[in-house]
Amino acid sequence: MVKPRQRQYPTVTSYLNIVRESLFITISGVFWMYCIVVMIVYIGTLINSQMESVITIRIALNVENTEIYKLFGWMSLFVLIIFIFFTFSLAFQKYKKGRDI
């Protein structure tokens, strides 16, 4: 009869491909730098900043102040619609659950 002993769990050995991982980190870093630059430009435009770097980047991206204001207007409208939809959905769900009890 076999004596009981601790189980041996298989270990997973993984060798990361250094080229693939470095390429992934580089692409991710470039993406995050672009996102930070765009956020700086949008925030600078929304607070009506006259910093030279914000104006230069806005000219390089070919974006006007009115376009950014329109974009945030549309975004706020959609956020409001989604907020109202989810609020009514939650209220209806609570009402239906209370009625079933």
Swiss-Prot record:
For the keyword Membrane, the answer is yes
The protein's topology relative to the membrane is: Multi-pass membrane protein
Under InterPro entries, the record lists: IcaD
Disulphide bond pairs: none
Cellular localization per UniProt:
Cell membrane
Q: Which GO terms of the cellular component aspect does the record hold?
A: plasma membrane
Q: What happens when the gene is disrupted?
A: Loss of cell aggregation and PIA production.
Query: Which keywords does UniProt give here?
Result: Cell membrane, Membrane, Transmembrane, Transmembrane helix
Please list every transmembrane segment annotated in the UniProt record, as residue ranges.
Answer: 21-43, 71-93
What this protein is reported to do is described as:
Necessary for the synthesis of poly-beta-1,6-N-acetyl-D-glucosamine (PNAG, also referred to as PIA), a biofilm adhesin polysaccharide. Is required for full IcaA N-acetylglucosaminyltransferase activity.
Regarding protein family, the annotation reads: Belongs to the IcaD family.
Q: What is this protein called?
A: Poly-beta-1,6-N-acetyl-D-glucosamine synthesis protein IcaD
Report the source organism. Staphylococcus epidermidis (strain ATCC 35984 / DSM 28319 / BCRC 17069 / CCUG 31568 / BM 3577 / RP62A)
State the organism's lineage: Bacteria, Bacillati, Bacillota, Bacilli, Bacillales
